[in-house]
């Protein structure tokens, strides 16, 4: 947002977005270091609560900063900033950035699959996974870091497109089961398909106007989220 307000190009916007994700991750590590850097051990519900509440507070801080940037931005750039907040694939056509994103996707997927076995055990509970030899805290730190990197890259290219990371894994698990060796690559591909489908609908349903991608994914994601909450 700050890069857009300053009139920066696509590469600078991507770098600012990725840098913001890494800064938020670093802040999470600093504020919740006792929970994230604790020694491996049995499940600790208080540790989970600390990480969750710290993440909520960081999200609130980021929302406040975004509000300030929007209120101080020039009028001519407000539309671009709003579209970026709601998701815009305009930056994804930048070939150098797109190529780097594909390379990053391959590397991140390989890193995630490395922990697929541990994730399968964690589905049965952290205590059970720990008793079977999974270094739960180290796996947690590694996966949080990978998630932050992947989120930073995605936001750098497409803006703040929400609910894709929630909808795609649930649909994949519904059809193919919970084996993370299958879920991780399938969910990443399905997520990309959902975003492209939402972008295509947004560009065609009200042409020549363009509907924001994030709004369309939210219209799909919110009902699925509520449906999941109501399941026994």
Locate each region found by the language model.
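Alpha-helical transmembrane segments in inner-membrane proteins
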Residues: 1-232
């Amino acid at each position: 947002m700050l890069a857009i307000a300053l009139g920066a190009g696509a590469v600078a916007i991507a770098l600012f977005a990725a840098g913001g994700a890494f800064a938020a991750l670093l802040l999470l590590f600093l504020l919740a270091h006792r929970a994230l850097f604790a020694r491996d051990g049995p499940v600790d519900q208080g540790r989970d609560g600390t990480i969750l509440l710290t993440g909520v507070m960081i999200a609130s801080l980021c929302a406040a900063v975004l509000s300030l940037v929007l209120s101080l931005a020039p009028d001519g750039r407000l539309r671009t900033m709003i579209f970026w907040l709601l998701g815009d694939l305009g930056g994804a056509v930048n070939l150098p950035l797109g190529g780097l994103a594909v390379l990053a996707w391959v590397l991140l997927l390989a890193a995630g699959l490395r922990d697929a076995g541990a994730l399968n055990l964690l589905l049965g509970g952290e205590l059970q996974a720990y008793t079977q030899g999974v270094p739960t805290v180290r796996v947690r730190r590694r996966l949080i870091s990978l998630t932050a990197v992947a989120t930073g890259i995605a936001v750098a290219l497409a803006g703040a497109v929400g609910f894709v990371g929630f909808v795609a894994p649930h649909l994949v698990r519904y059809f193919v089961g919970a084996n993370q060796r299958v879920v991780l690559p399938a969910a990443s591909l399905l997520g990309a398909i959902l975003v492209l489908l939402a972008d295509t609908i947004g560009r065609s349903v009200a042409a020549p106007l363009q509907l924001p991608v994030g709004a369309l994914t939210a219209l799909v994601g919110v009902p699925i989220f509520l449906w999941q909450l109501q399941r026994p």
